[in-house]
Amino acid sequence: TSYNAQEKVYDAQGKFTDEVVKNFVKDGVGIMRFGRLLDQPPFTHTEILNATQKYVIESNRHGIPTLYYGEALHGYMAEGATVFPSAIGLASTWDTELVEEVYSVAALEMRARGVTVAFTPVLGLARDARWGRTGETYGEDPFLVARMGVASVNGLQGGSYPYDQNHV
């Protein structure tokens, strides 16, 4: 029998229970993968993450929350989220304010669903067009990549969090 993602995470009464969460999280730690959670409507997506987070915090003696990650190469990659041009396309504008705005929208959409870590464009230089990740970069110009990297980090963090300048 084949089940869709919603059928797999809800019990027979249509509830997302602690028992269901325990199947995802052994001993309150580890890496969780919910399959095609990203295909779920925003409310369902958020409900699942919130229930899992509650379980993890309550089941470990230090109350340490889990980190949820999400792809944000050109907007948050999830059902109903905003999609923007690719990183290399955004870089071609040389518009750092635009890039900051793009990633502030992605951050808002991710936070609204409980996602705490964003996988974003590659800040390495694309020196060889044969590299499979070239389209996920801001290009080959060090000055441009640095400016776009700072703008994307500022957008994601809202300018309110310190970041390690050695890695931007």
PLM-predicted stretches and their roles:
Residues T1-V168:
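Glycoside hydrolase catalytic-domain context in secreted enzymes
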